[in-house]
């Protein structure tokens, strides 16, 4: 693999440029009607991509080279999955909150699901607008079951490409839709969310200036290959393996040389999710 510049999505590292070496379905499909989300609504749903590349000078945060590659790759991938993709670039923290609030107030009753992708600098529990931090919980709370009723019981996917701390992973050698008869039942307001983080809590998240981030590269590749074959959690497991085994940082600074990364999936989904129906 060609060596190109690689960075991490953390506000605390400046001018770091290491390199990389590297539903509902008929029973004939094998998908259980009772155990999978209904994905045959008239529309698949919205996919909101917030792509923050340039930050206000007052923040001290560097430009995120390579993020436009991620945004373009995501746009193509989710359009191919029949999502309505809306790209937003360089949003302030206030604009992020306003956008998410407005989207949560839309009528999603004819949509099967919702996807939000956040590409930015970050820390644990935080994503950065171009002028400062936003608590991730503030963003996702707009879509809770008690606040966005038209998405209640539907999968809400948040994909987050950002650092979650300043730790570096050195690696180690190894051998190796609510049914009608259930409509009156209550469900937890936090149910049916999935958070796909690019890295484990506390760690850096690596991004390549030419090819985009390791995580988004891998996610798009696995969705393109398996979205019409596998359940989403199985796809994400393959994403984890791809990031863990196929990528490693290269830097003349020994501190940042030969580092690894593992994505982290937090699922509150209550059914299996298939993108095909």
Curated annotation (Swiss-Prot):
Where in the cell is the protein located?
Cytoplasm
Catalytic reaction list: Strict requirement for an Asp residue at positions P1 and P4. It has a preferred cleavage sequence of Asp-Xaa-Xaa-Asp-|- with a hydrophobic amino-acid residue at P2 and a hydrophilic amino-acid residue at P3, although Val or Ala are also accepted at this position
Which GO terms of type biological process are on file? anterior neural tube closure; apoptotic process; B cell homeostasis; cell fate commitment; cellular response to staurosporine; DNA damage response; epithelial cell apoptotic process; erythrocyte differentiation
**Where on the chain is N6-acetyllysine found, per UniProt?**
11
InterPro entries assigned to the protein according to its UniProt record, in alphabetical order: Caspase-like_dom_sf (IPR029030), Caspase_cys_AS (IPR033139), Caspase_his_AS (IPR016129), Pept_C14 (IPR002398), Pept_C14_caspase (IPR011600), Pept_C14_p10 (IPR002138), Pept_C14_p20 (IPR001309), Pept_C14A (IPR015917)
Q: Which residues carry the post-translational modification N-acetylmethionine, per the record?
A: 1
What are the Basic and acidic residues biased-composition ranges?
Answer: 11-20
Q: Under which main EC class is this enzyme filed?
A: hydrolase
Q: At what positions is S-nitrosocysteine found?
A: 163
Record GO cellular component, one term: cytoplasm
Disulfide bond annotation, renumbered to this chain: none
Q: How does it assemble?
A: Heterotetramer that consists of two anti-parallel arranged heterodimers, each one formed by a 17 kDa (p17) and a 12 kDa (p12) subunit. Interacts with BIRC6/bruce.
Family under the similarity heading: Belongs to the peptidase C14A family.
User: What name is this protein filed under?
Assistant: Caspase-3
């Amino acid at each position: 693999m060609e060596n190109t510049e690689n960075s991490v999505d953390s506000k605390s590292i400046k001018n770091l440029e290491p390199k990389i070496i590297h539903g509902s379905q008929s029973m004939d499909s094998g998908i259980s009607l009772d155990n999978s989300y209904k994905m045959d609504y008239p529309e698949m749903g919205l996919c909101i991509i917030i792509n923050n590349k340039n930050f206000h000078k007052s923040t001290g945060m560097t430009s995120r080279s390579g993020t436009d590659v991620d945004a373009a790759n995501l746009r193509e991938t989710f359009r191919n999955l029949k999502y309505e993709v809306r790209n937003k670039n360089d949003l302030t923290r206030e604009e992020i909150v306003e956008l998410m609030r407005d989207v949560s107030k839309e009528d999603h009753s004819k949509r099967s699901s919702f996807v939000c992708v956040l590409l930015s600098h970050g820390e644990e529990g935080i994503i950065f607008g171009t002028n400062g931090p936003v608590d991730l919980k503030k963003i996702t709370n707009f879509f809770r079951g008690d606040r966005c009723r038209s998405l209640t019981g539907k999968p809400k996917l948040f994909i987050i490409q950002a650092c979650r701390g300043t730790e570096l992973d050195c690696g180690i050698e190894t051998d190796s839709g609510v049914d009608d008869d259930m409509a009156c039942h209550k469900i937890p307001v936090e149910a049916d969310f999935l958070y796909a983080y690019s890295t484990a809590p506390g760690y850096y998240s690596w991004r390549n200036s030419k090819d985009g981030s390791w995580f988004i590269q891998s996610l798009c590749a696995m969705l393109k290959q398996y979205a019409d074959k596998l359940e989403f959690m199985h796809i994400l497991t393959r994403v984890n393996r791809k990031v863990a085994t196929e990528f490693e940082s290269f830097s003349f600074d020994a501190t940042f040389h030969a580092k690894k990364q593992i994505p982290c999936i937090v699922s509150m989904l209550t059914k299996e999710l298939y993108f095909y129906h």
